[in-house]
Amino acid sequence: MTEKINLLNLSETELQGFIASQGQPLYRATQLLQWIHQRGVTDFSLMTDLSKPFRQQLSEASFVRVPELALERVSADGTHKWLFRLADNNKIETVFIPDRKRGTLCVSSQVGCALNCSFCATGKEGFNRNLTLAEIIGQVWLAARLLKSPYKITNVVMMGMGEPLLNYEAVVAAMHLMMHDHAYGLSKYRVTLSTSGVIPAMRRLREESPVSLAVSLHAPNDALRNVLIPLNKKYSLDQLIPLCRDYYSRGSKRCVTFEYVMIEGMNDRLIDAKQLIRLLADVPCKINLIPFNSFQGTAYRCSTESAISVFQKCLMDAGFNTRVRRTRGDDIAGACGQLAGQFHDRTGRHQRWVQKQGHDFNRPIPAIDH
């Protein structure tokens, strides 16, 4: 007997192939996209503009399954953080950040993270596996159903757990669905992928997906970036910066956004700002300064407000569009760099971290009753 297929795990092209294999016209794929993503229907029997024989055919050959809600927390500032349970019982985190007329969903791409950035809680938890397409787009599907009016998803950022470009195929397919007119209909300007700088995948992304690009920079030189982002030892700044400079075509109004976490005494001095100015001198870009969000066991501390202000002014005086990202959801460990999830670490990285610190830093998350 042929194994049933989770339709959420199919790209648009694969869904069309599945429809053709069922002897149906291709417009059925569009109908399914609308039922599943726009209307949130996963029960084929309720898809009333499909014929009864086709609905029966679908139920025999396929299903629609999303991750399930394990826990939810809501911050004092309105930020929502969800812990989603996957079929293998690993759990990932997804965050929704409301802001006036805008609602940004921060989506995870891996169970844990394959990288080990020193300032990020996810990296200290280790790594289990890549998420499937169904598990990535399923976060968007679930969030859209869990949010109550007036909250609405207007933007998606691939900035949750994991390095998106180390899960390229599933992430790009999911972002395509986010922008698809018959799914979530988001503009390419409202879907952003953040990467630590996986150079080959960045080159491929530039050719294959129109989404906005953000780069986790966090340091103005290789020596410091090697400490903060070990991936830099493989893909150094002399490879990363030229690619960012030429990522969008000349004359385009679009530019790369650089993310720069502000860590006291490490990368927040005036000399660091001046070095950053020289590094990015000919790169069309925006710069987001991110106050460091602490997590248990880290020795890092956030820069002072005055240090951040001086740093920002130095960059702005040099002509850089620079903003300080307002910290959201830190009271529920939902801010940038704080996502951890709950999963089995296949790398042993988390256990080494625990042994080094002397105790376990897994944080229990209280549930909200539904």
From Swiss-Prot:
GO terms for molecular function: 4 iron, 4 sulfur cluster binding; metal ion binding; rRNA (adenine(2503)-C2-)-methyltransferase activity; rRNA binding; tRNA (adenine(37)-C2)-methyltransferase activity; tRNA binding. It is an enzyme of class 2 (transferase). This is Dual-specificity RNA methyltransferase RlmN. Specifically methylates position 2 of adenine 2503 in 23S rRNA and position 2 of adenine 37 in tRNAs. m2A2503 modification seems to play a crucial role in the proofreading step occurring at the peptidyl transferase center and thus would serve to optimize ribosomal fidelity. Keywords: 4Fe-4S, Cytoplasm, Disulfide bond, Iron, Iron-sulfur, Metal-binding, Methyltransferase, rRNA processing, S-adenosyl-L-methionine, Transferase, tRNA processing. Signal peptide: none annotated. Its cofactor is [4Fe-4S] cluster. S-adenosyl-L-methionine binds at residues 162-163, 194, 216-218, 293. The active site is at 93 (proton acceptor), 336 (s-methylcysteine intermediate). It is found in: Cytoplasm. PROSITE patterns: RADICAL_SAM. Disulfide bonds join 106-336. The keyword Cell wall biogenesis/degradation does not apply.
